[in-house]
Amino acid sequence: METFGHVDWLSVTFDADFDERLIEAYVGTFKTLGAGSHGYTRRAQSKAGAVLLADGERRQGKSLTLSGTVLEGLRTILESDGPILDFISHHKGRASRLDLALDIVEATITPQSLWAEYQAGMARTSTRSNLALTSNERGVETFYIGSRQSDKFLRVYDKALEQKMDAKSWLRLELVCRRLVARSYVSSMVEQKSIRPFINRAITEFCDFPLSAEFREATAQDNADVPTLARKIPHFWRWMETQVIPAMASRQVEFPEENVLKTLTLLYHKHLEKRGRNLRPNDALLDSSE
């Protein structure tokens, strides 16, 4: 049995001023193909297959997508995903999608065997959403744990069947991460000497198959810290972050003599009282007696 862990998809947004010639050193020169989507007026593709969306509204920045094929080609030159992750971090890129793949090759483990373990209630996972896709010849060939509309879900599938390699055993576990999860994971992976333990830990924390000896062996090295994020930002904090705080910051500039932070603290206290919570010392952003 052989196992491999790697990044299999990476979508990143850079600031509008990002010099795309910097990434061309890795993926080759970009050629404009036409108009982009989602408000971008330019879509370009590099020699290696990287896709760039640019020239939209300034707040949109520039969007770069590296597919599994592009990343595989980069690994043959750079030897790992580390240099690309370092580049993204150095240039303040913000990941919007990150796929972490674990390949288990030439083993007896199959999507069907792991699905049976999951159906028997023996897999450990915090999500109840799932979907299985069946092939008449091999039973379950692909299944998903978690909603495909969420920020994180696991896809388990027969990679050999996908690649039409019938004589080979090749199982892939693919953890698809989006938005805040993707951004947090990329930031954490930059700090790792090797990303393989991080991939193992990220997968097993989301869904573990303890009865499969081959799965346990493939994910045995998992001594990495994986950040835990809230599933959804509460509406109150989203309102504070997107509307109240920017407005108060603008008011502080306009009226420097006014104690805007004190006003913000009082608003926070009212929110706690509305929820029926007793105020504690740590709940105060600023002592309201000032």
Spans of model-derived segments:
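Structured, helix-rich domain cores that form ligand/interaction pockets
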Residues: M1-R231, W239-E290
